[in-house]
Amino acid sequence: MAARPARHVLALPECGAPGDGGANARALVLDTNIVLDLLVFADAAMAPVRTLLDAQRLCWVATPPMRDELARVLAYPQIVPRLAFYGLTAGELLESYEAQVRWVDVAPRISAVCKDADDQHFIDLAVAHRAILLSKDKAVLCMQKRLLVLGAQAATAIVFEASGWTGISHRGPVATTSDMQAA
């Protein structure tokens, strides 16, 4: 019996196509902890994000206040030794960040308010750009339905297989394309 598709995976057919030079790339907003997973810790769960960014199927959008928040986090006493362990400096990491993002204006505040005020600017930007917002923050993830109505999606990870992008994962195990076809 084939596995049923996980309810937490959403198909995203509107994603940019390979080889279109990023012209139709889907906007992506990363909260600060996800940025650390991508740029510092090389978290395996971030491999699909890296692949899709490199292929210009996603366009990482950010604002100067998001960069400032990252700079502040990189100075935290618990982060500094981790940077050193990976042979990185805060300056190098910020340069890498700046080279990879598309700078945009701070988005206007939306009607959906996050319980964690520190995360509101990520939500506002995701809605303004009809973006995927990757976050592990429960205050953000509990807003999934409200964000969908506003044209944005919140998730913890992007799912990618050899056959292509299957969707985004909100939590838990991930359904694959073959699981979805068998259901």
Task: Give short role names for the model-derived ranges.
Residues D37-L39, V73, R82, M143-Q144, ...:
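Residues that scaffold the ATP/ADP-binding catalytic core of kinase and kinase-like folds
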Residues A2, E98, D118, A157:
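Divalent-cation
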Residues A44, V61, L88, V113, ...:
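Residues at secondary-structure transition points
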Residues M1-A62:
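Short, well-structured N-terminal submotif of metal-dependent ribonuclease cores
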Residues D37-L39, L83, P108-K115:
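Short, flexible loop segments at the rims of nucleotide/cofactor-binding pockets, characterized by
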Residues A11, G16, V113, Q120-I123, ...:
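Acidic, PIN/NYN-like endoribonuclease modules and their adjacent C-terminal/linker elements
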Residues L52-R109:
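PIN-domain endoribonuclease scaffold, especially VapC-family toxins
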Residues I34-V35, M66, A139-V140:
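Alpha-helix capping/helix-boundary segments
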